[in-house]
Structure formats: structure tokens, C-alpha cells
């Protein structure tokens, strides 16, 4: 799984189910694929979205700014700055500065995520604010590691508030991961269908999978309900690849 897929998984885990979540999932997919190149339009769209908390908007704004190429002098957005100020708590800012110094020495996505997980969501948001306001610079991978750790802390607190048993791997994040991987698998099937005799069949299976994922994101589902989705998709893909004589390894 590429780290961008992981970022999409974690970010979606903190967004309430509904049509807006499906829309955000599509925007993230487009941004990571390099299809959405107007940061100003994207940020204006984000600013006016209902339902989302200021912090969620701040995190999404941070992700979009990291990913979409922009002019050097492009002004930072106030709604993102306000969301990433750690609630104005000096304690959060002190911890954010300490974390930033550690992240500056880190170069990997997973390393940054591990370091960040020992801090509170407030301190993590403040650290994102430092980077967003150009007061500090880290690699893009490290910044995304910080994003994922923040989302994990938020998802954990949301999960606890649902009074469900907290396990080592958050069910909300596992659920989003299955959804993202199912969507990725559907894409692989569409790509393979290009010049084959079974193209129509593959495209139909992929299309059904995409519709199912879209419906589940829009309607909202319990984390356990997506468990069979990815497995069904992978079985369909494997059966199709077997007929085509294609090695599964290429698409893992």
C-alpha cells in the first residue's frame, strides 16, 4: 500500500459518513492522482463545506496544500491557520515545537507517524500549523506521517466516545482502509481490461465494486460491514487474472 493510500485511509476515518464524505474521497483521489491542480478553487470549496469541524477542514486544507502545486507567493488561508493553532493553548505550542525538532531529523513517512503518535491531537495540530505557516519545513512524506498520526488520535477519541472496545488497530481506520483498497482494486481491474476479450466482464465487475463502495461511503456503514467487500473484490480480480494468465504479484 502506497503511503498516499494510507493518507487517504486515515483522513477519511475522521469524516462523518454521508454524501460529503463520498465527495471528499473523490477529491482526495483526484488530488493524489495529480488531476486537481487549482489549489485556490479547492480551498474555497473546502472552506464552504457544511458539517465538517474546523479541525477536519484544517487537516484537509493542509493535505491539499502539501499535494497540489501552487505559486510560491500564494497566501495561506485563515480558516486553516485558525484550525491548526492547537486551540491557542501555549502548552500545545511548546510540545509542537519539540515534535517539530524531532520530525526535522526524520525522513520516512512511518518513522514520522510513530514519533507523532506519542503526542496529543492538539500538539499535533499545532505542529501542522507551524509547517503550514512556513515556520518550519519537513519532507512531504514526514508531513503526511504527521497527518496520519493526528487522524489516528482523533479517530481513537471518536471510537472511545462510541463506547466500543478500543483495540490496537482502530476499527474505523480498518474499515476505511478496506474501502480504499477495494476502490484501488477496482481501478486495477479497469486498467487490465484495456485490450482483453473479457474486457466487458472486467469493467462490469469493477463498475459494480465502485458503485458499492460509493454507496457504502454515502449511506454510512458500521466498520464490520466492509469486511467481506475487499475479499470479494480480490477474489473476482484473481479469477479474472487467472483466465488472463496475469501474475497477481503485479497488482498487490
Curated annotation (Swiss-Prot):
Swiss-Prot/TrEMBL keywords: Host nucleus, Membrane, RNA-binding, Viral matrix protein, Virion
Primary subcellular site in the record, as a coarse category = virion
What are the boundaries of the region RNP-binding? 165-252
Compartments (UniProt record): Virion membrane; Host nucleus
From the UniProt annotation, give the residues forming the signal peptide: none
Q: Which GO terms describe its biological process?
A: viral budding from plasma membrane
Xref: InterPro entries? Flu_matrix_M1, Flu_matrix_M1_C, Flu_matrix_M1_N, Flu_matrix_M1_N_sub1, Flu_matrix_M1_N_sub2, INFV_M1
From the record, which residues define motif Nuclear localization signal?
101-105
Q: Name one GO molecular function term.
A: RNA binding
Gene Ontology cellular-component terms for this entry are: host cell nucleus; membrane; virion membrane
| Region annotation (Membrane-binding) ranges | 1-164
Q: Which spans are transmembrane here?
A: none
How this chain sits in the membrane, per its record, is: Peripheral membrane protein
Pfam families from the xrefs?
Answer: Flu_M1, Flu_M1_C
Task: Supply any other comment.
Answer: Most abundant protein in virion. When expressed alone can form virus-like particles in transfected cells.
- Subunit and partners: Homodimer and homomultimer. Interacts with NEP. Binds ribonucleocapsid by both interacting with genomic RNA and NP protein. May interact with HA and NA. Cannot bind NP without genomic RNA.
Protein function = Plays critical roles in virus replication, from virus entry and uncoating to assembly and budding of the virus particle. M1 binding to ribonucleocapsids (RNPs) in nucleus seems to inhibit viral transcription. Interaction of viral NEP with M1-RNP is thought to promote nuclear export of the complex, which is targeted to the virion assembly site at the apical plasma membrane in polarized epithelial cells. Interactions with NA and HA may bring M1, a non-raft-associated protein, into lipid rafts. Forms a continuous shell on the inner side of the lipid bilayer in virion, where it binds the RNP. Determines the virion's shape: spherical or filamentous. Clinical isolates of influenza are characterized by the presence of significant proportion of filamentous virions, whereas after multiple passage on eggs or cell culture, virions have only spherical morphology. Filamentous virions are thought to be important to infect neighboring cells, and spherical virions more suited to spread through aerosol between hosts organisms.
**Name of the protein described by the UniProt record:** Matrix protein 1
Ranked from the top, the taxonomy reads:
Viruses, Riboviria, Orthornavirae, Negarnaviricota, Polyploviricotina
Underlying gene: M
Amino acid at each position: 500500500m502506497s503511503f498516499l493510500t494510507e493518507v487517504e485511509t486515515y483522513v477519511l476515518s475522521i469524516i462523518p459518513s454521508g454524501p460529503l464524505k463520498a465527495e471528499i474521497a473523490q477529491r482526495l483521489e483526484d488530488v493524489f492522482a495529480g488531476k486537481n491542480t487549482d489549489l485556490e478553487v479547492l480551498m474555497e470549496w473546502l472552506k464552504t463545506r457544511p458539517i465538517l469541524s474546523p479541525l477536519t477542514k484544517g487537516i484537509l486544507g493542509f493535505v491539499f496544500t502539501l499535494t497540489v502545486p501552487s505559486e510560491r507567493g500564494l497566501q495561506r488561508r485563515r480558516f486553516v491557520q485558525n484550525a491548526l493553532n492547537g486551540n491557542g493553548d501555549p502548552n500545545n505550542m511548546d510540545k509542537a515545537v519539540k515534535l517539530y525538532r524531532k520530525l526535522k531529523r526524520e525522513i520516512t513517512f512511518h518513522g514520522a507517524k510513530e514519533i507523532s503518535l506519542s503526542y496529543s491531537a492538539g500538539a499535533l495540530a499545532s505542529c501542522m500549523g507551524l509547517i503550514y505557516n512556513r515556520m518550519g519545513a519537513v519532507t512531504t512524506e514526514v508531513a503526511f506521517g504527521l497527518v496520519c498520526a493526528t487522524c489516528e488520535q482523533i479517530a481513537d477519541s471518536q471510537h472511545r466516545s462510541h463506547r466500543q472496545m478500543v483495540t490496537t488497530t482502530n476499527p474505523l481506520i480498518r474499515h476505511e482502509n478496506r474501502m480504499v483498497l477495494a476502490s484501488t482494486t477496482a481501478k486495477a481491474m479497469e486498467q487490465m481490461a484495456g485490450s482483453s476479450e473479457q474486457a466487458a466482464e472486467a469493467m462490469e465487475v469493477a463498475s459494480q465494486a465502485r458503485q458499492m463502495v460509493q454507496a457504502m461511503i454515502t449511506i454510512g456503514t458500521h466498520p464490520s460491514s466492509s469486511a467481506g467487500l475487499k475479499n470479494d473484490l480480490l477474489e473476482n480480480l484473481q479469477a479474472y487474472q487467472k483466465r488472463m494468465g496475469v501474475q497477481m504479484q503485479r497488482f498487490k
